[in-house]
Amino acid sequence: MAKVEIDEGSGFCFGVVTAINKAEEELSKSGTLYCLGDIVHNSREVERLKAMGLIPINHEEFNRLHNAKVLLRAHGEPPETYITARRNNIEIIDATCPVVLRLQKKIKQEYIQEDNEDKQIVIYGKNGHAEVLGLVGQTTGKAIVIEKLEEAKSLDFSKSIRLYSQTTKSLDEFQKIVEYIKEHISSDVTFEYYDTICRQVANRIPNIRKFAASHDLVFFVSGKKSSNGKILFNECKKVNPNSHLIDSAEEIDNRLLIGTESIGICGATSTPKWLMEEISKAIKSRI
């Protein structure tokens, strides 16, 4: 019989754990709580919390809401969200990850700093991602977002650059962008960069590579919207081509299980442990 192992290092990061704990605590008191966006990029966990009374809303719905209680998830929000909350008498339950909060403050300080320098504030991140929207909001929309090294080539190298990163991005790609800017920026201006990638996320890359390489077959469990999930799954795939992205046991092709001796189950920072355990049980029942 095949050995089935769940990666101990996979599962929620502390920022997501805090957000979910806050949601559960509020729901146990009131039974109803709004959440601005999905609390986590995992549909199964979202459904579990919805059954407890959590109501996900978008920004348009938030703007129309009055006299209510709203949870802000770990990704963080731009300043406009807090202004709307005060105007509409909305009580905020702020679950912004402390790592994201520190980054927001750094970017805001850089933006409001009066140093008479014509500089570009650049954020390496995914355009439209909730965290990135919150970061760009600290600069009243002036920050430049780049998603990959190729996009860094269109920066104005005659102006100073301050480079930051979305907390869940790839450290390798960030370092490539840093090296490219160093090589191309004018000697008359300044370049400062801040490695703001969360170490709890970055450290998972070498660990998940090791885990994936130690199994014949790997099921990476993640919601399709998870940026971190995409990065970690790609790392699994690099070391073990027999890695498969799933978000539930229903997506497992039973033919993959035939003749396999070792099966690994791992996931993103937005993947609940209970879901990986559920998938492990389903696999064991089929082999």
For each predicted feature, which ranges?
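The feature marks the mature, well-folded catalytic cores of soluble enzymes
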Residues: 1-287
